[in-house]
């Protein structure tokens, strides 16, 4: 599956999708080799229907690699040189594209959200397991060292005690009301909706810090959600601002989460956690690219833990972790196991039911 360059293994990647996220992922994969513990090479790039676009992406974003360009996904997944495919198409396409790759015996890393709903995700996980293939959702923040540091402070050192009040906000001003009606962000059939686009980040932070608390004993929270919604040009309903409250009875903790495409970030700290002992923990940066932890004790003493970097975006943590999984013949990543992906999909399905947002993919699993 891998080849050798001297004494170092090389992981060969194929890209299914050549958009803006793929460009950033490619830059981190091969543009900052000093950041990596494993060697990576992009050997193939495909778009759904344009070899020219694939070739242009390869030339503009994959140097020093010289990947083969394909004008269809079907061609790339049959390329024997590819060890793993990275899928960055829009999320309504994930189910079909992941399934195509798995049926052609390719290991898969697929951008978040893995699918539109839980039944799609479950089917893909079961397919990967049946074919004994590595498969992971590309939720890159789970691989950041800052996440491990925050969990150590809270779950092992118990710096904020045992009962938490968590606030997380991920909001950006897309001038939503001014977007053209045919914009992807305003077309539900194309995956429009802030919950799946952005809201999964605050939800993930709540699971990392509250759900994963050993004292919670893996008990799922109660969920209450509200949203501001819009009607698209097809008459479908999507959400553009959504608020979710999660209550964890086992630890008497609560998470209040907000996400919006119609408001900008209010402060440098996207996350605040109040502890029962008066201590507070803040995480600054972006919800998807955290930079530092600040612990303010009730006494006024402040500690800052810096994890900032400016030479890359931050995908390299995920990329190396996935490579290590392949080299060790692991079938899922410990940072984002299949069980957690499925539980997150169940959670977003539950929230969507509460805010009355559905997608065409949901209709495949609706029974009379």
UniProtKB/Swiss-Prot annotation:
Q: Name one GO cellular component term.
A: cytosol
An example molecular function term from Gene Ontology annotations: nucleotide binding
Coiled-coil spans in chain:
none
Q: Which UniProt keywords apply?
A: Cytoplasm, NADP, Nucleus, Oxidoreductase
**UniProt GO BP:** D-xylose catabolic process
Q: What is its EC number?
A: 1.1.1.179
Q: What does this protein do?
A: NADP-dependent D-xylose dehydrogenase catalyzing the oxydation of D-xylose into D-xylonolactone. May also display activity with other sugars. May play a role in the regeneration of NADP(+) in the presence of these sugars.
What is the protein's name according to its record? Probable D-xylose 1-dehydrogenase (NADP(+))
Species for this entry: Schizosaccharomyces pombe (strain 972 / ATCC 24843)
Organismal lineage = Eukaryota, Fungi, Dikarya, Ascomycota, Taphrinomycotina
Gene expressing this chain? dhd1
């Amino acid at each position: 599956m891998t080849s050798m360059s001297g004494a170092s293994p090389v992981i060969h990647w194929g890209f299914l999708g050549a958009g803006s996220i793929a460009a950033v992922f490619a830059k981190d994969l091969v543009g900052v080799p000093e950041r990596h513990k494993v060697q990576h090479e992009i050997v193939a790039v495909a778009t759904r229907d344009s070899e020219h676009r694939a070739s242009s992406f390869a030339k503009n974003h994959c140097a020093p690699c010289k990947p083969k360009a394909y004008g269809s996904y079907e061609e790339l997944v049959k390329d024997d040189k590819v060890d793993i495919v990275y899928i960055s198409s829009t999320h309504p396409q994930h189910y079909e594209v992941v399934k195509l790759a798995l049926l052609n015996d390719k290991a898969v890393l697929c951008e978040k959200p893995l699918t539109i709903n839980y039944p799609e995700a479950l089917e893909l996980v079961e397919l990967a397991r049946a074919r004994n293939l590595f498969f992971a959702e590309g939720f890159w923040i789970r691989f950041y060292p800052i996440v491990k540091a925050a969990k150590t402070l809270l779950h092992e050192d118990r710096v904020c005690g045992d009962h938490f009040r968590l606030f997380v906000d991920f909001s950006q001003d897309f001038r939503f009301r001014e977007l053209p009606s045919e914009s992807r962000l305003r077309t539900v059939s194309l995956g429009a909706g802030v919950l799946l686009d952005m809201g999964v980040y605050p939800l993930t932070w709540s699971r990392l810090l509250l759900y994963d608390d050993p004292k919670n004993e893996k008990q799922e929270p109660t969920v209450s959600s509200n949203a501001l919604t819009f009607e698209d040009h097809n008459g479908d309903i999507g959400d553009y601002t959504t608020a979710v409250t999660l209550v964890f009875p086992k630890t008497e903790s609560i998470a209040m989460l907000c996400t919006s495409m119609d408001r900008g970030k209010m402060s440098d700290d996207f996350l605040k956690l109040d502890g029962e002992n008066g201590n507070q923990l803040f995480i600054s940066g972006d919800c998807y690219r955290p930079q530092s932890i600040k612990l303010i004790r009730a006494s006024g003493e402040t500690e800052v833990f810096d994890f900032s970097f400016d030479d890359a975006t931050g995908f390299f943590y995920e990329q190396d972790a996935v490579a290590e999984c392949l080299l060790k013949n692991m079938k899922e990543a410990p940072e984002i196991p299949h069980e957690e992906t499925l539980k997150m999909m169940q959670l977003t399905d539950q929230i969507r039911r509460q805010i009355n947002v559905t997608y065409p993919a949901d209709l495949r699993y609706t029974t009379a």
